[in-house]
Amino acid sequence: MQRRAFVIVLDACGAGELPDSADYGDAGANTLGHVAEAAGGLVLPNLQRLGLGSALALRGCPPAERPVVHGRLHPMGPGKDTITGHWELMGAITPVALRTYPDGFPADVIEQLRDGTGRGVLCNKPYSGTAVIDDYGEEHLRTGDLIVYTSADSVLQIAAHEDEVPQAELIAACQVAREIMRGEHAVGRVIARPFRGVPGTFERTEGRKDLALDPPGRTYLDELRADGVPTHTVGKIGSVFNHVGVDHEHPGATNPAAIAGTSRLIDELEHGFVFTNLVETDQVYGHRQDVPGFHRALQEIDRAVGEWTAALDPERDLLVITADHGCDPTTPGTDHTREHVPLIAAFAGHGGRRHDGPFADVGASVLRWLSGREADSLPGTPFL
């Protein structure tokens, strides 16, 4: 019987502040805990049954009677973004924080971007992704200039209306930006953000594309591939790793699409590793401080978890549910928050133990489950 492993990342579902959260302006952050309080209690029967309420105190989600392995994980390196969170889950630790641009990008970067794309630049400052198209979209349509902005994360984003800048041209512009944003100006990601509509009703499309840096070293994805284990990603994870260590990438720009893609792989995959990102708790609800929407997204995920656990064979399959960082929608800011993340791990013989450790324990456990070995050169201790 060939084994399989599934790691599901609930994007931005942080599980409480870290000792250094205050250094990032995130003292007291607790994404899941505060959503639970603000929602009047979480209604997540399947995640509760597995042990989410055993991992951390959550209103409406009491400790499970018979939990699987549960606990909280912490990052080993700096940062609080998608890139570093996913990299750390697979054992790649960034020794220094990726560069951010709280005052916008320097003049030489903007000049190179103008020269390389043949278009002007609007905005050039940290901005909410939805607000920036509301505030600059009309001028963009009038001038054809690209909307270039950043956030508290290490990212350069380019927004453009699909009727003004075709998708292929927008991606080409992002490729120009990716080459510029290396070396001293390196950012974790360059992101294409197409949008549609008319002034007052602009909305992002699902044509987002991420152009990342390569991970800073070998990862557990590389270890799995070296052992002949097929690696699959669902959603944005393939691009987060700049496609390094990934055999097959499956679409998942929305939670329904990523859930459906994961369900398909559960039904069809004979052997391998599936690494899924469920993005909407971050992209749609966390950054927009929408607590009811955040809870609804968790409930949609919970229903999928019920279907997945019914379909999986604990003797054959490892299921890990975790996150990459926080994005507490009850705090004044709209940026990510530096937090612990939850850990739920279901497999035969789990014993209901508590396990607290670094993010990299996830990758170490996947390698142990699928290859029966450890990678001495990578951080992480299996919780199997």
Name these PLM-found stretches:
Residues 1-384:
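Feature captures the catalytic ectodomains and active-site-proximal regions of enzymes
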